[in-house]
Design a protein with these regions (language model features):
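Conserved catalytic cysteine-centered active-site region
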Residues: 56-112, 152-158, 223-249, 330-357, ...
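Flexible glycine-/small-residue-enriched beta->alpha junction loops
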Residues: 2, 105, 111-164
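Active-site-proximal alpha-helical scaffold in enzymes
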Residues: 87-118, 160, 166-195, 256-263, ...
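Conserved active-site "lid/cap" helical segment
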Residues: 1-57, 61-75, 82, 161-173, ...
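Beta-strand segments within the central parallel beta-sheet cores of soluble alpha/beta enzyme folds
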Residues: 47-55, 82-87, 112-117, 175-182, ...
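Condensing-enzyme catalytic core mediating Claisen C-C bond formation in acyl metabolism
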Residues: 1-28, 37, 141, 225-291, ...
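N-terminal extracellular/periplasmic Venus flytrap/periplasmic-binding protein-like
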Residues: 11-13, 25-33, 41, 175-267, ...
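Active-site pocket-lining segment
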Residues: 160-164, 199, 207, 277-346
Length: 393
């Protein structure tokens, strides 16, 4: 890159179980909590933010069209600073970092508040065509979340794309379940070691009984066993592989980072977490969208002048165990350096927020281990992949 962009730090909310403790907190309010946490942990003042870019895949609340703008305002960013909501589906959280970095490189801004947010619990049920009225017997209630998870271009649900990868790359059900168990086990180890506590900013949830501070992910199932996973029936096809146990969890959550150019970092005498080295996106066949991280990673490595051997840690979003394993096989990933604290199978996958969470988790772990380079990558519904390489500073 022609101009260095640095990640100063960030925070994420806990990942809340579908229709669980965070179900009444909108994506925007989750985003605002993460944004305020990011500002606090970096000691950057809200009035020092020049632009806000937030990723969001499903617009589920009534005020969702205001997206990043409302996140910025609720985080205390002044009225005269603009905001942008971006949607590259599951890559939105990384795309927000890319878009903010591009603004910094172009000299438009010095700082940017970036991140992602998602409330999957608030995805509404809708009746299409109601404005024009219905004939007798018409008017079908539609689950917008389930409908969104079907790629109508190729008439394949997201889980179906994972089934396709399992067959194409000869990934057995047993392999998928073993990997799902590994995700749960590593997430438990990380949680017990206080790893996630460094990332999380609590969310206050109010009710008639008072308020409670939610400070832990509640989707992980540490009691998971291989025997239990093997008993689960395929969720989408009788002869399929994908089950509730080897797919990512539907959850609510948000994550945010503060990024800045070198001039701002030097002027404020700040100590960044990392430097953004490169990024890339790539298209693949929609029917096997989960393989998207492979070409995206190769492009990001090429742009950085690096090889996979130079990468100390990798975070690959675990949309499905079959999808992760296909990517692992194609890239030749070393599992000892990949998803070392578990992933979306255990923690959950809040679509627009996941990418930012991956980068935040990656940077924290690079600092713990003293590694230099890290790669975060995700597949994207519709047939894309996105990847970002960062360097510990």
């Amino acid at each position: 890159m022609s101009k260095d962009v640095f990640i100063l730090g960030g925070k994420r909310t806990p990942m809340g179980e579908y229709v669980g403790v965070l179900k009444d907190v909108s994506a925007i309010d989750l985003g605002a909590v993460a944004a305020r946490g990011a500002l606090e942990v970096t000691s950057v003042q809200a009035d020092e933010i020049d632009h806000c870019v937030i990723g969001n895949a499903l617009q589920t609340s009534g005020d969702a069209i205001y997206g990043a703008r409302h996140v910025a305002l609720k985080a205390g960013v002044p009225f005269d600073r603009p905001a942008l909501t971006v949607n590259r589906l599951c890559g939105s959280g990384i795309q927000s970092i890319v878009s903010g970095s591009q603004m910094i490189q172009l000299g438009e801004v010095r700082t940017c508040l970036v991140g992602g947010m998602e409330s999957m619990s608030q995805a509404p049920h809708v009746i299409r065509g109601a404005r024009s009225g219905f004939a007798l017997g018409q008017g079908k209630l539609e689950d917008s979340l389930m409908v969104a998870l079907l790629d109508t271009y190729c008439n394949t649900p997201m889980a179906g794309t994972a089934e396709n990868l399992a067959r194409k790359f000869e990934v057995s059900r047993e392999e998928q379940d073993k990997y799902a168990l590994r995700s749960q086990q590593e997430a438990k180890r990380a949680k017990d070691a206080g790893v996630f506590a460094e990332e999380i900013v609590p969310v206050e949830v109010k009710s008639r009984k008072g308020s409670v501070q939610v400070s832990e992910d509640d989707h992980p199932r540490p009691e998971t066993t291989l025997e239990g996973l093997a008993k689960l029936k395929p969720a989408f096809a009788h002869d399929g592989f994908v089950t509730a146990g080897n797919a990512s969890g539907i959850v609510d959550g948000a994550a945010a980072l503060v990024i800045a150019g070198e001039d701002f970092v030097k002027q404020k005498d700040l100590k960044p977490m990392g430097r953004i080295v490169s990024w890339a996106y790539a298209g693949v066949e929609p029917e096997i969208m989960g393989i998207g991280p492979v070409p995206a990673t190769r492009l990001a490595l090429e742009k950085a002048g690096l090889s996979l051997n130079d990468i100390d840690l990798v975070e690959v979003n675990e949309a499905f165990a079959a999808q992760y394993l296909a990517v692992e096989k194609e890239l030749g990933l070393d599992r000892n350096r990949t998803n070392v604290n578990g992933g979306a199978i255990a923690l959950g996958h809040p679509l627009g927020a996941t990418g930012t969470r991956l980068v935040l988790t990656l940077l924290h772990e690079l600092h713990r281990r003293g590694g230099r380079y890290g790669l975060a990558t995700a597949c994207i519904g519709g047939g894309q992949g996105i990847a970002m390489i960062v360097e510990r500073v």
